[in-house]
Amino acid sequence: HPIKHAGEAAFLDLISGGRLEFGLGSGAYQREFDRMRPGLLQTDGYKYMQEMLPAVLALWKGDYAHDGEYWNFPTSTSVPKPLQANPRIWVAARSPVTYDYAVANNANIMCWPFTRPHAEAELYKRQLDEAIAKHGGSADPIFALMRHTAVYENQKDRDEAINAITRVLGQFENLYRNLDDVKNGFPKEIPLQELEGREQYEPTMLEQNLMFGSPETVIEKIKIYEHLGVDEFIYYASMGLSHAGQKRSLKLF
């Protein structure tokens, strides 16, 4: 709910000394929607996000009443207010409609090409450029890109990273396909060899497409994204590596 989000986010800004960066996404899995708002299709989640953001921003400024398609509430406000006059806003975007919305609302961009090749990142940059042009060409949002990341210096650590990401991707496909095979919070891993189009999950493709490799290799990959126009890189660490393996990777990065 916009009022709940506004208050909780403002409180975080308060207790963190004004360090809030507020990010919104439309949701990933139908399983989430089935439990949080039964009857809502995941494909319609973006409509709620698009109505929510302007409401949250207005609640941070002062008294505000909302009469929308998905929420209605009388005059309300956020207590407390954020310490920052204008906290940095982020929108997770992968489709033209979301890039257009982010630019129209002065939001920055977070994108994630999954395990797909560099062409997917190029597609997202084109969508961003088209949205900026559509809105007059003066917008200058921060363009952030996320990739699973593992930096290693030997075959053993490389194999650990590949095995870890393979397990996580098998669980991801379970959730993505809404197979409802989740026990105590852990989705069953789908054998990737059973999937169509599984070439994107081949170890060589994973190592090529993701931010995997030696420090020197990773530097070259980051330079490619920098050349594309990526402003900030998001190190995606949640991939099942051991704690020691994750620390090694972070230090090498």
Describe the function of each predicted region.
Residues 42-78, 119-230:
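An alpha-helical appendage that flanks or caps ligand/catalytic pockets
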Residues 1-66, 109-110, 115-117, 163-164, ...:
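Flexible, glycine-rich active-site loops centered on histidine and acidic residues
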Residues 20-24, 89-92, 107-112, 141-148, ...:
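Hydrophobic faces of well-ordered beta-strands that scaffold small-molecule active sites
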Residues 15, 105, 228-230:
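Structural motif
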Residues 12, 22, 56, 89, ...:
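Conserved, mostly hydrophobic/aromatic
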Residues 4-8, 93-100, 215-224:
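Short, acidic/polar
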Residues 5, 49, 121, 218, ...:
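Aromatic/hydrophobic pocket-lining residues that form the small-molecule binding cavity
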Residues 33, 112-118, 236-249:
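Glycine-rich, proline-tolerant flexible connector loops at the mouths of alpha/beta enzymes
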